[in-house]
């Protein structure tokens, strides 16, 4: 008996395996940056007990790097002297921008002369938004790839020096806004170009993480915080995690118009209320429209699926395409026809769609949209530089008295 008790006691019951947590729809695994890949925050020291320096480089690209890349034929065509026919091409100090170089373990930190101070970093972001992002003679995918790389270098320079939270936030805000605009401008064929949409999405998420950690440290003021907290929610529309994080913000901050509208958009998206959702999307300024653009195709597909369930009959029921154009903020009848045909719905002439039972299908990703109505038209003559550097989203709105 005692032997049996000892044998039984030596084998305690094996604990049940923990259930895996489901991944949030707006945070796919490939877009969650691992801690080892995240750039350090602007105030985090790379080595304990070391005081971070302040950069002293006055140029967008240090002279030593310009000379090295010139010798090695590693200058981008956006960085060479216009019309230069030399071999190798000569770097233009007014156009060359420091490229991103991943910090290696054991490698000494760059000296202050190789780091750009926050004022130069902000001027660099302004240049990227105003001159490079607006380039009309270069494919948008190539522009996005160049801008994204140079913005990574901006954030790394910021992380390697002792910048204050207020000035760091201004640089992070401008960099993130620039990245959102160039990503939104990518066309349907961007996946075949030099810009990788998955990597760009991960970089946007990292940008939001760095900026929101800067806000969370409490040192301010941060006048654009309501707008950028709203951008975070719009970019992660439908994410339970993102909504939870926003709802943890102080009530005074959540009461600001940019965040109130972002919360309303998120609620309409969750409820599947297409009419309310697209009415709200049409009222958003340009930058929030860039942030939410990645969800427009899925929202339109969900709305079309609801139409198919409601209107489909064995003999077919028709609906004017003009109704869909207005309800879903499409760019015209042609886009409405393309949307219906991409989901297996036949057309009756040029202006009506037929909902036949069993014909609606979903294959692959929703068709890409130019989003002229929902995004491009909202520039209203403004340049990207003006949108990125100005407080467009906060104009005429109340700001929280104390976000702490």
UniProtKB/Swiss-Prot annotation:
Residues 203-379 form the PCI domain. One of its GO terms (biological process) is cell division. Involved in centrosome duplication and mitotic progression. This is SAC3 domain-containing protein 1. The keyword Phosphoprotein applies. Keywords: Cell cycle, Cell division, Cytoplasm, Cytoskeleton, Mitosis, Phosphoprotein. It is found in: Cytoplasm, Cytoskeleton, Microtubule organizing center, Centrosome; Cytoplasm, Cytoskeleton, Spindle. The modification Phosphoserine is found at residue 402. Residues 12-21 have a biased composition (Pro residues). May be part of a SEM1-containing complex. Belongs to the SAC3 family. The gene is SAC3D1. Residues 87-101 have a biased composition (Basic and acidic residues).
